[in-house]
């Protein structure tokens, strides 16, 4: 091998060794020396979580008060829901709601659920509703939510029974109106827990139906 070839080989080896030493000495790093920018090193931003209380309320009810939330049905598509003291009494998921009037009875002192039933007010027999309303026990709270059509089969007797429970709108209830209500047996005066929307082409949110109603809050035992 010529001397020039040997020199080239030595030069190449020297360059490789020198480069390797340079990399090792100056470009090596450890994780301890890495400093991330503050915006990268900062711990992830915590999601803001809104604490919810019984029946999804954003504020807790006072001691000895009952939490409730009632939603009417949306058109003839989504059924109503009734929650009382964090118990879902009626809902589409429980498969115990129906077209017309959905009614739950609750003990006004203990909050215990006494029963629930749906009444078809479009093609059903209104006398089933009348019988049910007449048999409501004393001291019971009456929770009502409409779905689709709550008013077609209503008669004077059923309207009076609801009025006696504290309703201000039972006498006006008609075809496809939206209505949510909490009343009580032997109530003196009118209930403060009631919402009503008339079915009107000028104000309806859905085609042929008014907007669903949502009523929530807290009530004391024997609130009326």
UniProtKB/Swiss-Prot annotation:
Gene Ontology MF, one: cytokine activity
Signal sequence, renumbered to the chain: 1-25
Keyword Ribonucleoprotein: no
Tissue expression from the record: Abundantly expressed in placenta and weakly expressed in small intestine.
Source organism (scientific name): Homo sapiens
The keyword Transmembrane helix is assigned to this record: no
Intrachain S-S bonds: 55-83, 61-218
Protein name from the UniProt record: Protein FAM3D
GO biological process terms on file: aorta development; negative regulation of insulin secretion; neutrophil homeostasis; neutrophil migration; positive regulation of macrophage antigen processing and presentation
TM spans (from-to): none
A GO cellular-component term linked to this record: extracellular space
Compartment(s) where it occurs, according to its Swiss-Prot or TrEMBL record: Secreted
Pfam families: ILEI
Limits of the GG-type lectin domain: 64-222
Sorted UniProt keywords: Disulfide bond, Glycoprotein, Lectin, Secreted, Signal
Glycosylation-annotated residues: 107
CDD domains assigned: ILEI_FAM3C
Family from the record: Belongs to the FAM3 family.
């Amino acid at each position: 091998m010529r001397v020039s070839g040997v020199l080239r080989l030595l030069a190449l080896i020297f360059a490789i060794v020198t480069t390797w030493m340079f990399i090792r000495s100056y470009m090596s790093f450890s994780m301890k020396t890495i400093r991330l920018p503050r915006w990268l090193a900062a711990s992830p931003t915590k999601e803001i979580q809104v604490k919810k209380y019984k029946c999804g309320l954003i504020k807790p009810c006072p001691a000895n008060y009952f939490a409730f939330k009632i939603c009417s049905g949306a058109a003839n598509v989504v059924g109503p829901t009734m929650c009382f003291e964090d118990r879902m009494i009626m809902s589409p998921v429980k498969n115990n709601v129906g077209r017309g009037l959905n009614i739950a009875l609750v003990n006004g002192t203990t909050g215990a659920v006494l029963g629930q039933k749906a009444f078809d007010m479009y093609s059903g027999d209104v006398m089933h509703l009348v019988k049910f309303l007449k048999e409501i026990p004393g001291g019971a709270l009456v929770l009502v939510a409409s779905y689709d059509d709550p008013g077609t089969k209503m008669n004077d007797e059923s309207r009076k029974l609801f009025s006696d429970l504290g309703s201000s709108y039972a006498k006006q209830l008609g075809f496809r109106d939206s209505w949510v209500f909490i009343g009580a047996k032997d109530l003196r005066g009118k209930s403060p827990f009631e919402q009503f929307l008339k079915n009107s082409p000028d104000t309806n949110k859905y085609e042929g139906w008014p907007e669903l109603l949502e009523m929530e809050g807290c009530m004391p035992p024997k609130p009326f």
